[in-house]
Amino acid sequence: MKRLSSVAVLLALAGPAVAGDLLSVYQEARVSDPQYGGARASYLAGQEKIAQGRAGLLPQLSVNGSVNYTNLDARFPGSTFFRGGQHDFASDSFGVQLTQPLFRPINREIYEQGKLQARASEIQLNAAEQELMVRVSQGYFDVLLAQANLEFIRAQKSAIAEQLAQAKRNFVVGTATITDTNDAQARFDLANAQEVGSLNDLEVKNRALATITGKYPGGLAGLASPVSLLAPQPADIGAWVEQALGSSLQVEIQRVAVEIAGREIEKSKFGHYPTLDAIASYTDSKANSSAQGFGNALRQGVIGLQLQMPLYTGGAVSSRIREAVANKTKAEQDLENARRQSALSAQTSYLGVTSGLAQVSALRQALRSSEVSLESTKLGREVGVRTSVDVLNSQQQVANARKDLAKSLYDTILAQLKLKQAVGRLNEEDLAAVNRLLSKQ
């Protein structure tokens, strides 16, 4: 009772529960998962790189102005024209300048890099979405497996309790020894301990899923029975590896990174190039007095070209070129690493699916055999050739077979999703296909 009370308190503190199937939990996670939310924000930030890069190619308009008060003590020895002495006067000016870049190759490279960075942020968001699908599925099936384990243990505990009661009755009437009772009691105590551990494991798995969805899970749909899983198509591990090398999102991200690094080399080289801008400006200034003793008003309009040619930068440009070349080499190595990791991921997931399907088939047969063996053992006990301990062992074997089958099913489904993720093709329709394997409990 104390354990159940503790669980009730934990449930109350967990907040609103989210119930439903895999798709509904995924939709909840899209809204609430902080990792995916951060990826969305990064995507929006990355898209701004295009506008920022384009700005360097467009006209720049600026305005300036000033208002000044001057106190001047002037002396003009020997001058009969200029008045010396103390002068106080105010002045103000206003100006507008328009600059249009005509030749700024660095700005062009920044714009091209911005487009690539925006593309990279889009791919990263897609990768984050696929990763969210896998994390939600993993968390969802972890909860289902923990629930199944708890159900198996409770069923086993119930069967042991019946055997314990029967052993006690048989001992009283003299048809069984105290050994049978002690053995059943030991198994019952162990089942109690396993139940406590399973309850804790279920709580941990529920809370792990809640960190993704923001809500405590409740009433999740489980796998329907029977479940039919399909083999990967094409049934060729090499074909899946080729797809991963060509369309893996991690590989695509690194390809874009190599392009960006190449653009950075070109941008650095353009540090040796001149720049040319078209300039147009207008200035209006006036003062009510001056050192000469009279005021002035000036209006000036200027239009022209401004050329800047770097002659010597202390070796900074050459250093930046070497740095950019080294960074591109690193990006190329990162690309190769991404290709190898994607190939390994595709191979691992493919083998996980194929071996999982074989294991599911074998475990189904093992479960059928265990159930037949249990019935035979029960019959043997009735005729006196088997003991209650034999029945308990057979029941434990059935429970283990069911638990192993459930885990194998969940692992195989996850491997199927990860295989699609490895080749960059995991989408919501794949989750919908898994969802169709579920039924409300």
Name each model feature, range by range.
Residues A14-G15:
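N-terminal signal peptide c-region/cleavage motif recognized by signal peptidases
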Residues R3, E131-Q243, S349-G352, G356, ...:
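Periplasmic alpha-helical coiled-coil/stalk elements that build and connect Gram-negative outer-membrane
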Residues Y26-R30, K215-S281, E429-Q441:
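Amphipathic alpha-helical coiled-coil scaffold segments and their short linker/junction regions
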Residues G38-G53, A128, L132-F152, E162, ...:
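Amphipathic alpha-helical coiled-coil segments
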Residues N64-Q100, L223-P234, E266, I279-A316, ...:
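Small/polar, glycine/serine/threonine/aspartate-rich low-complexity segments that form flexible
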Residues S24, S91-S93, Q138, D183, ...:
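Transmembrane beta-barrel architecture of outer-membrane proteins
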